[in-house]
């Protein structure tokens, strides 16, 4: 199988340096328009697609990001390995601003977003016990360390709806739950990537201590913006290190991410809604054709 790397860039990461034959491409999906056109090209010989999650100019809030269209569009382009890069707050003293956390678990507290490609007319249940790809996450950690940034492998990401930051009570609650970082965008993104059978890794770039820390007070947007710049530089270095680690060819995912739908479809073929099936052509075409 040919490798194609996808990158969804969050706050502060709006482009990828060094892409050859780079072109912004409009991708149409049955779920509406993605956040923006998608920058495609090659990096060190490996095909790559970059999508700014909030759109160029930061036009989408965490709630209005078209998550389904974004994942569908990347799947249509042939993305096999998808890396999410996003800003986050930290609940742990040791996970300091400027550090990267390679997320391996989520608690989803978002509530105003469509969270599945499936539904009435074609029901499917995929496993999210391990919502990120262990293989891809390990390679991201390796590439991040090569940039000199401090990397923490493993951590639980609390996804809040936003766009406001947490209250002090919320921040203390989430910390007491054992969460490591907090952000607004990785859900339902990770869920949809699993439904689309795309290997997904989440690189959470710490910008602040949320509002729980007694010596840092409430979230300071000015300080966040300053940290975003440094984090973005390291993120670009991480992405630059991925082609050499992933290569141009890939085997089946050892964790089964690319076969997540093998036993997931529940609706009998004769009862499936043709209109929904038509919308699932990219996401679930492998199993629907079978």
UniProtKB/Swiss-Prot annotation:
<dbReference type="InterPro" id="IPR010044">
    <property type="entry name" value="MTAP"/>
</dbReference>
<dbReference type="GO" id="GO:0006166">
    <property type="term" value="P:purine ribonucleoside salvage"/>
</dbReference>
<feature type="binding site">
    <location>
        <position position="184"/>
    </location>
    <ligand>
        <name>substrate</name>
    </ligand>
</feature>
<keyword id="KW-0328">Glycosyltransferase</keyword>
<dbReference type="GO" id="GO:0019509">
    <property type="term" value="P:L-methionine salvage from methylthioadenosine"/>
</dbReference>
<dbReference type="GO" id="GO:0005829">
    <property type="term" value="C:cytosol"/>
</dbReference>
<protein>
    <recommendedName>
        <fullName>S-methyl-5'-thioadenosine phosphorylase</fullName>
        <ecNumber>2.4.2.28</ecNumber>
    </recommendedName>
</protein>
<comment type="function">
    <text>Catalyzes the reversible phosphorylation of S-methyl-5'-thioadenosine (MTA) to adenine and 5-methylthioribose-1-phosphate. Involved in the breakdown of MTA, a major by-product of polyamine biosynthesis. Responsible for the first step in the methionine salvage pathway after MTA has been generated from S-adenosylmethionine. Has broad substrate specificity with 6-aminopurine nucleosides as preferred substrates.</text>
</comment>
<feature type="binding site">
    <location>
        <position position="185"/>
    </location>
    <ligand>
        <name>phosphate</name>
    </ligand>
</feature>
<feature type="site" description="Important for substrate specificity">
    <location>
        <position position="166"/>
    </location>
</feature>
<dbReference type="Pfam" id="PF01048">
    <property type="entry name" value="PNP_UDP_1"/>
</dbReference>
<dbReference type="InterPro" id="IPR035994">
    <property type="entry name" value="Nucleoside_phosphorylase_sf"/>
</dbReference>
<feature type="site" description="Important for substrate specificity">
    <location>
        <position position="221"/>
    </location>
</feature>
<feature type="binding site">
    <location>
        <begin position="208"/>
        <end position="210"/>
    </location>
    <ligand>
        <name>substrate</name>
    </ligand>
</feature>
<keyword id="KW-0808">Transferase</keyword>
<dbReference type="GO" id="GO:0017061">
    <property type="term" value="F:S-methyl-5-thioadenosine phosphorylase activity"/>
</dbReference>
<feature type="binding site">
    <location>
        <begin position="53"/>
        <end position="54"/>
    </location>
    <ligand>
        <name>phosphate</name>
    </ligand>
</feature>
<feature type="binding site">
    <location>
        <position position="11"/>
    </location>
    <ligand>
        <name>phosphate</name>
    </ligand>
</feature>
<comment type="similarity">
    <text>Belongs to the PNP/MTAP phosphorylase family. MTAP subfamily.</text>
</comment>
<keyword id="KW-0660">Purine salvage</keyword>
<comment type="pathway">
    <text>Amino-acid biosynthesis; L-methionine biosynthesis via salvage pathway; S-methyl-5-thio-alpha-D-ribose 1-phosphate from S-methyl-5'-thioadenosine (phosphorylase route): step 1/1.</text>
</comment>
<comment type="subunit">
    <text>Homohexamer. Dimer of a homotrimer.</text>
</comment>
<feature type="binding site">
    <location>
        <begin position="86"/>
        <end position="87"/>
    </location>
    <ligand>
        <name>phosphate</name>
    </ligand>
</feature>
<dbReference type="InterPro" id="IPR000845">
    <property type="entry name" value="Nucleoside_phosphorylase_d"/>
</dbReference>
